[in-house]
A protein has these predicted regions:
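Solvent-exposed interhelical
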Residues: 175
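Membrane-helix and juxtamembrane interface regions of eukaryotic multi-pass membrane proteins
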Residues: 3-6, 10-169, 180-248
Length: 248
């Protein structure tokens, strides 16, 4: 019996190791791929800006029009698909259960892909635009998002599921903003789409933040989440109001 118990304990120890190795086997290629994306943006960004006329659209010193179009598949398709696949892999138990699983084991290719993808996607703009050409509000937005992402994915990992869903909500608003900035010809439809989509996006993000806060034990952690969500949603909504007022 002791030998069987020892064998079971040994197998129990080996299973997390095997899971970790599996995740590394997924995470390493993803990391290399994301680095290659940054390198590609660094090499192709300036020529693309030159060919397409550089920064265009409603916002001065915003992303180039080609960058806005390029972002849409990731914002509207890839991130939601990653969430759905990861959620189904856990038996569709809900965002809270996903967060608890992530806090315990830090495993799952869909989760790791999101963890790596989101900050890399934001870093692209630093390579494409450069610090000197970025709007201050855009720079503040990107830095805040990257810092918040690291905090939500690791120190406060129990809220990972709700955080992931909140990012999808925010990226939906950024997606309709990109459609507006892309300059599609059917104005004022895109203006109304931007204003309505951003409002819905911010409300959904606040809903997710409310549930995320319930997973955080420390008061300081809750305060960080409330402040970051509040600042981001207010900034985004103000920009949407300004664009709506100017364009209608």
């Amino acid at each position: 019996m002791p030998r069987n118990d020892d064998a079971a304990a040994k197998n129990g120890k080996q299973q997390p190791i095997a899971q970790a190795l599996t995740d590394r086997a997924v995470a390493v290629p993803m990391t290399l791929w994301l680095i290659s994306v940054l390198a590609l943006a660094f090499c192709l960004g300036p020529p693309m800006n030159l060919v397409t006329g550089g920064v265009q659209g409603f916002f001065s010193n915003g992303p180039p029009r080609w960058r806005a179009a390029w972002a849409l598949p990731t914002q509207m398709v890839l991130m939601p698909v990653l969430f759905v696949l990861g959620h189904r892999a856990l038996g569709s138990q809900g965002p809270r259960a996903w967060g608890l699983q992530w806090a315990r084991e830090r495993r799952g290719p869909n989760a790791w892909c999101f963890v790596l993808l989101f900050p890399t996607w934001l870093l692209l703009d630093f390579f494409i635009l450069g610090l000197e050409d970025m709007r201050p509000i855009m720079l503040l937005h990107h830095v805040t998002c990257i810092v918040a992402h690291m905090i939500a994915c690791f120190p406060f990992a129990a809220g990972f599921g709700w955080y992931f869903l909140g990012v999808i909500s925010l990226e939906f608003g950024s997606g309709v903003c990109n459609i507006f900035c892309f300059g599609w010809p059917w104005y004022p439809l895109t203006t109304y789409l931007y204003f309505a989509g951003m409002t819905i996006s911010n409300l959904l993000a606040c809903y997710c933040a409310y549930h995320w806060v319930q997973t955080v034990q420390s008061r300081s952690g809750r305060l960080i989440g409330i402040v970051i969500t509040g600042v981001l949603t207010v900034m985004r909504q103000r920009e949407a109001h300004r664009a709506f007022a100017v364009s209608t």
